[in-house]
From Swiss-Prot:
Binding site for Mn(2+): 119
Keyword Hydrolase: yes
List of residues binding substrate: 69, 89, 121-123
Catalytic activity: D-ribose 5-phosphate + uracil = psi-UMP + H2O
Cofactor binding annotation: Binds 1 Mn(2+) ion per subunit.
UniProt record similarity statement: Belongs to the pseudouridine-5'-phosphate glycosidase family.
GO terms for cellular component: cytoplasm
HAMAP family hit by this protein: PsiMP_glycosidase
Protein name listed in UniProt: Pseudouridine-5'-phosphate glycosidase
Length: 284
């Protein structure tokens, strides 16, 4: 089994500010290489799907103003229009699956929005049908966490917490929402192999909490979020623009703390994902 780890490109184009986005993208690939894995950042370059962006393509995705944020549904649109596009969790999973990649590391998954509960991320639909190990620091903190967890259960997505039985929420380490716990990479690989054996659809979604030293207290986050939400209400931003807008305002109010935490949880997720990938390769 070739040890390839999928990485998304939306965090480069819309999740982190320039030039931190470029530095982080490069560092994540280097971290994977140190473990014997090959990280492939996925994106669409001028209408062509790329599994493994070059350094120059990463710089372009990070700095261009015309990079579309796409889920699975928009992949054919971006290809037909020959666009530059950054792939979210859903689009990255779909492309990775088509290329026989079985492990994917990301920051936070999308879910049910607090502001508009009809605004539900395509990530949940893709997680429900694509068999892959996805390592994440939890649903993004800006989401309705309980509704998101209910949707994960309804869609029969296998959710486990790595060394935790409490749902992490991206910047925040704990939420008092119970999830099933695993304590080893072998357990995670075994769960995935049973899904393969019995042809069960959907992801093994591994929630890996942000390290203690980089976590943000829930009360502090909620204060920054209220200010950011007020800015959103005063703006005309809708749909796919909501999350990048809120992340930008959170970075402003936290004086960059949320950006630093985002980078650290990404690095932590890549390390854990590579350990899982190495274990999976031994067991197949």
């Amino acid at each position: 089994m070739e040890k390839i780890l999928a990485l998304e490109s939306t965090v480069i184009a819309h999740g982190l500010p320039f030039p931190i986005n470029i530095d982080t993208a490069v560092e994540l690939e280097e971290l994977a290489a140190e473990t014997g894995c090959s990280a492939k950042t996925i994106g669409i370059i001028a209408g062509q799907i790329k599994v493994g962006l070059s350094r120059e393509e990463i710089v372009q995705i990070a700095s261009r103003k015309d990079v579309l944020k796409i889920g699975t549904a928009e992949i054919p649109f971006a290809l037909a229009k020959k666009m530059w596009a950054a792939t979210t969790v859903s689009a990255t999973m779909r492309i990775a699956h088509l290329n026989n990649i079985k492990v994917f590391a990301t920051g936070g998954i999308g879910g049910v929005h607090k502001i508009d509960q009809w605004d539900v991320s395509q990530d949940l639909a893709e997680l429900s049908r694509t068999r892959m190990i996805v390592v994440s620091a939890g649903p993004k903190s800006i989401l309705d966490l309980r509704s998101t967890v209910e949707m994960l259960e309804t869609f029969q997505i296998t959710v486990v917490g790595y060394k935790t039985d409490e749902l992490p929420a991206f910047y925040c380490k704990s939420t008092s929402i119970h999830i099933n716990r695993v304590d080893s990479f072998e357990e995670i690989a075994s769960i995935f192999l049973f899904k393969e054996k019995f042809n069960l659809p959907g992801a093994v979604l591994v929630f890996n909490p942000i390290p203690d030293e980089h976590a943000i207290e829930v009360e502090q986050f909620e204060e920054w979020y209220r200010l950011s939400e007020h800015d959103l209400d005063a703006s005309s931003v809708k749909g796919k623009g909501v999350t990048p807008f809120l992340l930008s305002r959170l970075a402003h109010y936290s004086k960059g703390k949320t950006v630093r935490s985002n980078v650290e949880l990404l690095k932590n997720n890549v390390k854990v994902a590579c350990e899982i990938l190495n274990q999976l390769s031994k067991m197949q």
